[in-house]
């Protein structure tokens, strides 16, 4: 059987293009298209960094961080672990994200994150770098003993109007397993 979304879509629809993919353990919205004019439009928007991607993350409150901010780092693959990225002072690939802490309770913070760039593992590495690893992240320090999946969710994508296409916004609801981990006092803060 097929074990990933791309294979399932190809089987059902034929040729598709993948414009917004997720790390294996991240839940939420993917953006796939069938061949056509939309692909040139999306390609242009992504290259110009005009697509607004919004994620929700539940992180460990190990450290105090600003209520909102911008994280700018340089990332490169780990020299020995190919499945891992590391922050470096020089070289690597520029990675930038904006974040907002929606609330904090019971040792957890609910954070909304907007990646500006789209590097592999970017949000996971950057949250860990800030000292607030994403819960369930076995690679970057938030899930060694929890047994939980990664609490990172691609919540929303906004595509601006351009080249004859209208503004579009897509969202994916949080899964029940994610919602159950959010402290009751923070549930009403969800966007």
Question: What is the predicted role of each segment?
Answer:
Residues 1-96, 103-106, 151, 165, ...:
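RNA pseudouridine synthases
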Residues 36, 116-117:
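Loop/turn elements at beta-strand to alpha-helix junctions within RNA-recognition modules
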Residues 60-62, 113-116:
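A structural micro-motif recognizing beta-strand termini
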Residues 89, 111, 135-137:
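Thr-Gly-centered strand-to-loop micro-motif
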Residues 102, 114, 160-162:
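A generic structural motif
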Residues 106, 111-114:
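Short histidine-centered loop motifs in beta-beta connectors
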Residues 120, 124-191:
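Pseudouridine synthases involved in rRNA/tRNA modification
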């Amino acid at each position: 059987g097929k074990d990933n979304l791309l294979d399932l879509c190809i089987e059902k629809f034929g040729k598709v293009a993948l414009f917004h993919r997720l790390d294996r353990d991240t839940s939420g919205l993917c953006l796939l298209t069938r061949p056509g004019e939309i692909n040139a439009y999306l390609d242009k928007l992504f290259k110009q960094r005009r697509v607004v991607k919004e994620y929700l993350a539940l992180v460990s409150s190990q450290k105090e961080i600003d209520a909102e901010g911008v994280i700018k780092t340089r990332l490169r693959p780990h020299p020995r672990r190919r499945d891992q990225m590391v922050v470096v002072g020089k070289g690597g690939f520029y990675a930038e994200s904006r974040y907002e802490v929606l609330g904090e309770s019971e040792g957890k913070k609910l954070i909304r994150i907007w990646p500006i760039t789209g590097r592999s593992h970017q949000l996971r590495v950057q949250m860990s770098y800030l000292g607030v690893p994403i819960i369930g992240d076995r690679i970057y320090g938030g899930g060694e003993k929890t047994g939980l999946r990664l609490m990172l969710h691609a919540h929303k994508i906004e595509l601006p109007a351009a080249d004859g296409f209208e503004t579009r916004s897509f969202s994916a609801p949080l899964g029940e397993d994610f919602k159950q981990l959010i402290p009751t006092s923070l549930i009403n803060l969800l966007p």
